[in-house]
C-alpha cells in the first residue's frame, strides 16, 4: 500500500529531521512501558486465523485473532531471529515471541520511529546467541537516547500522530474490502449474485 508507505516515510523523515544527532539525556528503559507477555503461540493463531483483530508475530505476516490483548499505540518487536519493529494504532494481539511495548508520556510514536532508526544496530548489537539469536532486552533498555522536552514532543506528535492514525484507518478499510470481496466473489461465481448495468 503505497499511501501507507509514503505516510510512514514522512513520519520517519520528520523524526530524523527533528531528533537525529540530539545528545542523549536518558535511557530507552526510561520511556518503555512493557505490555504483558502473550500466552498465544504463532501455531495457534495460524490454525485459528479468524477474527478481525490484527495478530503480530516475529515474522512478516500479520494474522487474525478474535480478541485484543492491547489497544492504543504499540510497538511489536521480534524477540528471536532478526530485528524487526512494527507499529499499530488500535486493538491488537501478538504472539509469545513478540515483545509488545509502548511508551510513557505520549512518546509511543517517537519510540517506534527511534527503534526503526536504529534497526541495523538492533540486529547487530542487541540480538545475540550462538544458534537462534534473541533480543537482549536489558541491554536495549540501557541504551542511551534523547528524550524530547514536552514542547518538542507536542509539536512532533501533532505532525506525526495523524499520519499513523491514517495508516491504521487505511489498514482497517483494506481489511473490510478484502472481507467483502471474499464474501461476494463466490456468490458472483455461482450465480447467487449478478452485476447489472
What residue ranges belong to the model's regions?
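DNA target-recognition domains and sequence-specific DNA-contacting regions of bacterial/archaeal
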Residues: 26-148
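Non-catalytic DNA-recognition/assembly elements of restriction-modification systems
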Residues: 1-59, 150-196
Amino acid at each position: 500500500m503505497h499511501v501507507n508507505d509514503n505516510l510512514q516515510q514522512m513520519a520517519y523523515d520528520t523524526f530524523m529531521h527533528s531528533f537525529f544527532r540530539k545528545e542523549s539525556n536518558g535511557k530507552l528503559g526510561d520511556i518503555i512501558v512493557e505490555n504483558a507477555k502473550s500466552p498465544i503461540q504463532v501455531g495457534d493463531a495460524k490454525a485459528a486465523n479468524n477474527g478481525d483483530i490484527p495478530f503480530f508475530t516475529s515474522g512478516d505476516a500479520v494474522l487474525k485473532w478474535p480478541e485484543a490483548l492491547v489497544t492504543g499505540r504499540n510497538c511489536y518487536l521480534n524477540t528471536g531471529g532478526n530485528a524487526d519493529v512494527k507499529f499499530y494504532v488500535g486493538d491488537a494481539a501478538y504472539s509469545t515471541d513478540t515483545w509488545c511495548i509502548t511508551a510513557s508520556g505520549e512518546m509511543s510514536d517517537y519510540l517506534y520511529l527511534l527503534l526503526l532508526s536504529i534497526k541495523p544496530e538492533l540486529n547487530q548489537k542487541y540480538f545475540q546467541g550462538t544458534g537462534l539469536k534473541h533480543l537482549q532486552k536489558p541491554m536495549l533498555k540501557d541504551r542511551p537516547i534523547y528524550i524530547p522536552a514536552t514542547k518538542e514532543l507536542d509539536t512532533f506528535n501533532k505532525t506525526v500522530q495523524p499520519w499513523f492514525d491514517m495508516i491504521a484507518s487505511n489498514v482497517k478499510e483494506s481489511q473490510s474490502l478484502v472481507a467483502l470481496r471474499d464474501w461476494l466473489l463466490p456468490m458472483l461465481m455461482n450465480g447467487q449474485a449478478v452485476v447489472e448495468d
